[in-house]
């Protein structure tokens, strides 16, 4: 995981970074599933369960789970295709549509089952991968800023003047310090896409203009806001004024049944003698403000009929640099560190997660693997030549085998000891022949007596020694016979 994160940090391409982050999250997810499966198999083997016997129940259980969890299987398949086809990555601004769901936001995590996004209101939404039928990615490779805005034709000489003024305002917006680094292509102007006649008395004719420019991925909203602001600033007098049927510009609209405006100071003699407290306070505040800033007071007198004209370019720049929800939703690809920074309210959760640095499931997995490894080390069987104790978890079985061997070999030696005594008492040829017959009889009868006894290595060795003892006197007997027969054969 650290190698992947280092590669993500050193990657220069934003798309590569997003894809690597997505694959890293899914890789950890799959590794945990495989590790838990191997842990379960190892535990079953340690407790003596037969995996061959569990194959049939596992097949039946998997079939039942597959029928009951079809949606989960569909989510896993959809997640696999999302990752392999690189439909979107971590940090992309996407919009999901389908099955009655329309939600958009920044992708913060992708797993095999679901995708987590954070909306512009900082709400975390979890969407199963198979639920969203249509996915619209606004941050793939590059984007295009599209501004469609109606422009009044009242203050311009002709349509060419309207097009020139609006295009000049748009180019000023694209040349700003914050906007220029995000521009990738040339400005494309579509003039007079629509003409809107006045619908009520006093409204001017409007011509709709469309401006298009290629920008970096995810920054189209920033460029669009800057273009609209600059166009409004250029046509401020036309937007902020009202017209009459004769075309004369006036400061405010005259609407029928308009309620009379109440003056702050009553001009009656009684009111002049005893002014109201609210009116006096208002007059005092106005006087104080006029004394503090004379220039602002002059500007307010000039624009008294239209207070909206007090907004100048400084106010517009402040609005442009104000809070931008789309930019705040843009993720930060820089990694804050190797360990996690999760917060858990319970004490046992903090202990299992090592203070929020790792997942609790990872801690449990490592603990179980350590416990199984400890039991495996304690149950290691020594070699056959090992003389010391094997441990209480692996008792030795050599003692019981030695006892049974000594008990079974003892009865075999009894009939073999009687064979040499008969051989020593035969001095003649006739007795030698009888002795050979007698000696051959016990040799063949010895295995018959030991039929009820289990054969061992010691019994076999003793039978071989018995046969050798019986054969040695038999060899000497013919020598003695030849010596005794030689004198008798002469006459």
Swiss-Prot record:
Source organism superkingdom: Bacteria
Keywords for this protein: Cell membrane, Membrane, Transmembrane, Transmembrane helix
Protein name: Uncharacterized protein Cgl1270/cg1434
Polar residues composition bias: residue spans: 384-393, 432-449, 481-491
Gene3D superfamilies recorded: 1.10.287.1260, 2.30.30.60
Bias (Low complexity) ranges: 279-291, 394-431, 462-473
GO molecular function annotation: mechanosensitive monoatomic ion channel activity
């Amino acid at each position: 995981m650290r190698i992947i994160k280092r590669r993500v940090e050193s990657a220069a391409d934003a798309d590569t970074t997003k894809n690597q982050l997505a694959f890293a999250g899914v890789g950890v997810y799959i590794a945990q599933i495989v590790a838990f499966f191997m842990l379960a198999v190892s535990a079953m083997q340690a407790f003596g369960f037969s995996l061959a016997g569990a194959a049939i129940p596992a097949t039946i259980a998997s079939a039942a789970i597959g029928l009951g969890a079809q949606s989960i299987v569909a989510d896993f398949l959809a997640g696999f295709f999302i990752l392999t086809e690189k439909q979107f990555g971590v940090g992309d601004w996407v919009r999901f549509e389908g099955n009655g769901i329309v939600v958009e936001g920044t992708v913060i995590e992708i797993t095999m089952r679901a995708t987590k996004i954070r909306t512009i209101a900082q709400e975390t939404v979890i969407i199963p991968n198979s639920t969203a039928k249509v996915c619209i990615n606004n941050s793939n490779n590059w984007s295009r800023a599209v501004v469609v805005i109606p422009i009044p034709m009242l203050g311009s000489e002709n349509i060419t003047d309207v097009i020139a003024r609006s295009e000049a305002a748009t180019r000023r917006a694209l040349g700003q310090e914050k906007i220029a680094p995000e521009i990738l292509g040339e400005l494309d102007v579509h003039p007079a896409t629509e003409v809107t006649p006045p619908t009520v008395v006093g409204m001017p004719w409007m011509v709709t203009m469309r401006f298009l420019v290629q920008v970096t991925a995810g920054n189209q909203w920033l460029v669009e806001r800057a273009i609209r602001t600059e166009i409004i600033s250029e046509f401020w007098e036309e937007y902020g004024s009202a017209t009459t049927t004769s075309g004369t510009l006036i400061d405010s609209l005259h609407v029928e049944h308009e309620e009379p405006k109440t003056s702050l100071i009553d001009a009656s003699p009684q009111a002049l003698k005893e002014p109201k407290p609210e009116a006096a306070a208002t007059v005092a505040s106005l006087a104080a403000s006029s004394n503090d800033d004379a220039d602002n007071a002059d500007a307010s007198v000039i624009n008294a009929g239209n207070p909206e004209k007090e907004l100048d370019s400084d106010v517009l720049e402040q609005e442009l640099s104000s809070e931008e929800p789309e930019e705040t939703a843009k993720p930060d690809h820089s990694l804050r560190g190797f360990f996690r920074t999760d917060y858990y309210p319970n004490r046992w959760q903090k202990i299992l997660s090592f203070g929020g640095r790792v997942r609790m499931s990872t801690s449990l997995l490592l603990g179980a693997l350590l416990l199984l490894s400890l039991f495996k080390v304690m149950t290691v069987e020594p070699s056959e030549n090992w003389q010391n104790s094997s441990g209480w978890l692996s008792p030795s079985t050599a003692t019981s085998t030695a006892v049974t061997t000594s008990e079974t070999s003892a009865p075999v030696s009894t009939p073999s000891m009687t064979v040499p005594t008969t051989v020593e008492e035969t001095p003649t040829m006739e007795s030698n022949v009888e002795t050979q017959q007698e000696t051959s009889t016990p040799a063949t009868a010895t295995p018959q007596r030991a039929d009820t006894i289990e054969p061992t290595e010691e019994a076999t060795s003793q039978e071989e020694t018995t046969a050798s003892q019986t054969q040695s006197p038999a060899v000497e007997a013919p020598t003695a016979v030849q010596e005794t027969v030689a004198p008798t054969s002469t006459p």
